[in-house]
């Protein structure tokens, strides 16, 4: 591991490799490159001090350098202990941007790195957060509540929370008053994923959201593309790299049929698997059934499944009892944000055999074995390299526009959760059409008037469901 005052990466000598992949990724990320061209001279993020907590991949490196080109100062960590691509982190460190991310870092290191992205060399404070899953945001908010005298650190509910609370206590002791000052300095947060967005909406509902937030996840050009088409390519990639299993003919159970579940089901179906879906929502269940999938309960499907994948963003979706009922050598994995979709903690007293990084074989008392991918964390990033660059360009272009919006116009926003306006969603999509050779048909003035829009758009009302 290579560490200094300004970065911690696995091996700084990987920077050259990372830079080569960055150069390739830029050609697949037209939205971000267009942002550099449009905003680079104006530097709308000059003065922004962005704390970023998002998977430290090659694609994220292109995002980071785009934010830098637009004037921002940045400190970055990964939002998952397994998702870092070490050569990407090295390239960013070599470019002089503080980054703290190592593939396979411990939970203790994870929360230490989350703390370090708020610790600026000049002793100043962050004024923006770019988050994925909400950990950076929650770190500051929980710390501020503890400083205010609330009893929020005494009862951790998981191993993750134990390390989280320990790091908060460490910072409380080292820098009294830090969290309260840091919370007050934040102009806004932009949140990447479903899980983090849910946390923000819960804070808003309770009146505990202390700054404006933009829900990037629910931009159409994020959720309907990254969540669906990204998973469609990266899920099977992760399973194959982790297990080398043949998926054709196998029975795969996908828990959840939201956007991630839809992409995951399509991914497995495309690989030839016989896919079954579990759902709690009757609308999503009906969609799955009419897309040709058998809708089942996990209790019924677990004994015959060869592959079980969770996609829900909920907890305890796959329980110990479910896993006990599964066949020998079943493959179990998760593509939702946190590791608690699968009751991994309940397996810790069993025999674990590490096959290779992020692949473990767990043996039950009756001799049955289970292959667990990435310890129940995001397998597409732990066992593979995540979504392709092109689809991440759409997601990250939304992030750039959201950061500009909150940093430059933050006073126009209340302490609520917002989504980007429709015209920006359409702009993001438009920026990616040329790369695919797609040409838009143009409305005449008469046609536009007939359906109540302008020829330039927006073309759909806010309530339209794509």
Curated annotation (Swiss-Prot):
Catalytic class of the enzyme: hydrolase
UniProt key word Hydrolase: yes
Cofactor note: Binds 1 NAD(+) per subunit.
Pfam families, A to Z: AdoHcyase, AdoHcyase_NAD
Principal location listed in the UniProt entry: cytoplasm
Transmembrane segments: none
UniProt protein name: Adenosylhomocysteinase
Organism (species): Mesorhizobium japonicum (strain LMG 29417 / CECT 9101 / MAFF 303099) (Mesorhizobium loti (strain MAFF 303099))
Gene: ahcY
